[in-house]
Amino acid sequence: MKLKNFLTSLFLVFFTFSVNAEELKIRDQNTEFNVYTGMFDFSDDGKKSTLLGFQHQNENLNRDTFLGNLSPITGALVTADAAGYFYTGVQAQYKLGALNFTPSFTPGLYFEGDGKDLGHIIEFKSELQFSLDLSNTSELGFSYNHLSNASLGDKNPGANSYMFNFLKNF
């Protein structure tokens, strides 16, 4: 009798942990990394430059609003001219089947390096991204953004950029 109770208890413990482990696996898919490359300020022939960037999104912190589902993002980009932009902000994601439309807004800090003088250290990035689901955890996309200091500085030339994105959920 004791052996039967022990085996039943042991089975329940292992069954409970295995069910919980599956829940944790599903819940762990809430972190998204976006690696992208493209052309910084493609519309200015004198100052355009190749860029490389990385962005992190944590969907555990998302919120449903009247604008849709919003989640925080943080990232950085560097250009071949040693300019850099470090940012944090918010993005929304709208799904149309396998196609995703993702607008975002991120204030950040811009460091000129040998690149374009944007007029101020504080810059605001507005971005539109379109991506296609490759699998449940991967997307391939294209995005366009504009950096501007919103006239905080004496000059506000702005910069238009395009990027090719690879997004992966973990």
Regions found by a protein language model. Name each.
Residues 1-28:
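Cleavable N-terminal export/targeting peptides
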Residues 99-127:
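Mid-chain, well-packed structural core segment of small domains
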Residues 56-58, 92-94, 132, 146, ...:
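Residue-level signature of outer-membrane beta-barrel architecture
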Residues 48-54, 132, 157-170:
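Outer-membrane beta-barrel "beta-signal"
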Residues 32-41, 67-79, 102-109, 143-148:
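Transmembrane beta-strand segments that form the barrel wall of outer-membrane beta-barrel proteins
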Residues 81-105:
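Helix-adjacent hinge/juxtasegments
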Residues 40-50, 76-87, 114-121, 151-159:
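Solvent-exposed loop/turn segments connecting transmembrane beta-strands
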Residues 21-30, 44-45, 60-70, 95-101, ...:
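Short loop/turn motifs that connect adjacent beta-strands in outer-membrane beta-barrel proteins
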